[in-house]
Every structure is written in structure tokens, then in C-alpha cells.
Amino acid sequence: MKKPQKPKDTKELLKKHHSEIFKLTKDEKVMEFVRKCNKEYVHWDQLRYKKIPNDIPPEYIWVILKLLRESQYKLFTFGSWTFHYELLDDFQKKLHILDMGTAGRIGSNIDSIASGRERYIISSLMEEAIASSQLEGAVTTRPIAKEMLRLKKKPRNYSEQMIVNGYQTLQKILTMKEKTITPDIILELHKSITKDTLKDKKYEGTFRDNNEVVVADPLEIEKVYYTPPDYKKIPSLIKEFCEFANSDKHDFIHPIIKGMMLHFLIGYIHPFEDGNGRTARTLFYWYVLNKGYWLFEFMAISRILVRSRIKYGLSYLYTETDDNDLTYFLEYNLSTIEEALEDMNTYIIRKQKEQSEALELIKSLKNINLRQAEILKEFLKNSEKMFVVNEIMTIYGVAYDTARNDLLHLTQLGYLEKIKIQKKFVFKLSKKRIIPE
């Protein structure tokens, strides 16, 4: 990934070309182009390649664009840094959708698949753990990783260990979402995320103790994108991070925007030798759940980040190279959340259909409950696959005995077969095929 070009100093440009730039502000065609660029929130590195009306120098357009933005900026000071951001109209729309989703329609839609609620939380946590690990270099496929998590298999390599760590840490987040964040909790989460994956085990759950860490291109190490602050500043920065996360003393910041700021700050502080990205995304989840946005339990945001990982990286670099303008990072992350929400809605529609089919199955088969009907549908979808109790237990979020009793009940009714393979019992669809498809 090529590092974006840093914009020229707008004050210097304005000083040199004041009269030419001022004239352009009276040109409606030019201003229409400027407004379009602002709506898209283009960075200088994008603007300089755009076709500009009347071949006007891009530097002139950039000055007008920056003046327009600066009039709308909100300031945010952290440590010795001053960040700023603009609440674009598009932000307000997306945040409203998320607020309404948490309060109303989407919630009732999820409740309509109540028997699958826990199941979907488990599935989304798996998806998030897999994708978040893939962003950091884990090499595996989703089906293999999901099977490992469902069967609770022991991880065989570095990539699988990353995924197991991520999944277990997200489960931990669900149990501690009411807590206030502290430096010790951040270290605890980092230790959980990085267990048995670091070159030097002593860095699990500890802040870095050197300045050798840089953010660089994984294929071209000499291409450094960003140099984090001195390691000696980390304890005080993390203390300030926790104060910012836990306090509402500042001017109001929408919780989702603030959660994204926390995500960004961990990447910016880079407090750890490794695992900064996974820790940042985990803390984002903690924060929005802590603020009552339970909807995020059902969204695998990192799966969207994986689809556009270059844009994810650029959202950091655009912010850094444009005077710490957080709008780039916020805009990208809100777009990924919107896409994750769309994925969730698609899932709910599919699950409502499957649940309806399961209810029809109950009518035709009798003697089974809704969960058992859904288990049967799972067997029908994977007619050649053999399932073990642990897998059903994980998929449906039930206790071991409940999963075992469901499978034995379906076997007694003749819908499944129980087979012993290498001292372990497995279940498969009955060859009698007496279940209506």
C-alpha cells in the first residue's frame, strides 16, 4: 500500500494565491465540485488525480475544501495531540439508523427468531474472531476455522491460536460489558488476545518497553507508515484513554463515534509489541456494548474490514497525513458498520424463513420442539456430514446435556443415526429419509 501524499500547507497556499482562490469561490461550477468532494470527503491524495473544472490547480481546490471543512470542525484533544472531525450529514443518517435499530424494529425482528438469538450471537462472535485475526495475518479459511471453534478443537498453528484467542476474548467482553475500563483490564484483554502467538511470551499482556515498533508495509518493512509515541509515554496515555472512555465530562460525543475514536487511539498509541489492531477492535465492541448498543453483539464488523482492508489502512493514513482529521477514519468505519448491519438484516430474513420451515416441520413430525426442528434442518442442509454433541452445543448455545438429549431424542424417533467412530459417538441423518424436505 502506497502512503498517501501529505497535502501542502493551506496557509502558505492561501497567502501566495489569495486573489485567485477568492475568485474561484464565486464560480458556481467550481463550488459545486468542491461540495461534491466534501460530501465524498476526499483526501488530497485523491483530489490531485480528479478531473477538475477548467483545469484549475488542485492546490486551489484543496484550500477551498479545507476552509469549508475547518468551519465545521469539532476539536478533540488527547495527550499532546489535537484531532478534529466533521459530523457529515451522512454520519447523522447512519447513526440515526443504528439508534433506531437498537430501540425498535431491528430488535423486534431479532426477537422474532428468539430461539436462534443465542445461536446468532455465537455465530457472529466466531465470524468477528476469524476476520479480526485474518486482518492481522491469520491464514485459514472460514469453514475450517468455524469447524475448529464449533468442535472446540485444539488449535494446530499460529493462525488457529489467534482465532481461538479472539473468540474467547469476545466471549469475555460479553460478560464484562458493564464494567468501566482500566489499564489492568486492557492488559488482561491483550493477554487473552495474544496468548501463545507472540515471538516473545513476556509481551503477552504487557505494554511495549522499546521504540522498535513501527507500522510498516508487511511486504516492504523499510516502508514505514507511522512511528508510534515513545514507549515511556504509554502508561500516562493509557490512563488518559481510560478516563476518556469512562467519563462523560467532555462535550457530548455520540457513543458510536466515541467508540471509533477509542479504536483509532489504540492504533495511534500502539501500546503493545503486537496485537494492537485486535485489542483496538475488541475495545470498540466493549464500549458500544457498555453504552447499550446490544445490536453490535450480532454484527461481525471485521468481516467487512477484511473485504476492504486497504481502505481500512488508508483511513488511518489519511487521518495522520491531513493534520489528524479523524473524519476519514470515522467515515470508513461507519460505512463498514452500515454494511455489517445490512448483512445482519439479510441473516434475520433468512433465519425467519428457516424458522418458519422448522415450524412446518414440527407440524408434520410432531414430538419435537422448535430447537430440535432447527437441528434437523441443519442435518438436512448437510446430509452427508457427521455431527458431534459439542458441535451442536456450540452452534445452538446450549448446555452439553441439552445438546446430547436433543440428538438422542431425534435418534430415538428415527430421524438420526448414532454411530461410534474411534471411541467417539457421532450423529448423522438417517438413511431412512423419513423427514419431509
Enumerate the language-model features and the residues they cover.
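FIC/Doc superfamily catalytic core
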Residues: 1-274, 278-437
